[in-house]
Amino acid sequence: DEVLDINYEHLFCTKQLRKSSVLEFISSTDYKNISILSASRELSTLVYTIYDRSKEAGGTNIELYLRHNLSLIKDDFDYIIIDNSPFKSYLTTCAICASDKIVTPICVDNFSYDGLMSLFDTIEDLNSKYSLAIEFAGIFMTRVAGRTTLYKQMFESYENMFGEKFLPVSIRNCIAVSESNTTFEPLLTYDKRCTAAQDYIEL
């Protein structure tokens, strides 16, 4: 399929009135029952546009526009999954506002823990500010190089801290992940038998 020339500003900064206006952003794929709204380098500059628009709007809840726009098409899909950068920005805030549930991967390091605590604060603030009911649904460990002492310690620590919200399946490091990204192919079709693919299936 031809890649659409997407005006992300319309999606993030304008309240669409018709479902058809939002569906124009969606592209079909070669994979059954999977459609995609592709990302772009343009998103890196959109954060400034969102900031400027929020100031121009005089307090209008522009962070909720993506949520509104996706709500127009939610009945057309079983799930809408937002794969988002952990970097805290206006885009991240819009994505969190648009979500009903948040699941986040964490690496075996203290930076992931610090980011997780910041995410909890953000969810709590947005729920309070906009009367939302965003649920933190769970975490899982990723990019696991091996069952090292540090990994075991952090696994046990997260398990004790989060209970049922800590998903007990860890995604192991696997060269096939990088290779599939390079070829723009889903991991499950690139190498379904690799360790990471099996871990994701179990997850």
Predicted regions span which residues?
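P-loop NTP-binding core
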Residues: 1-203
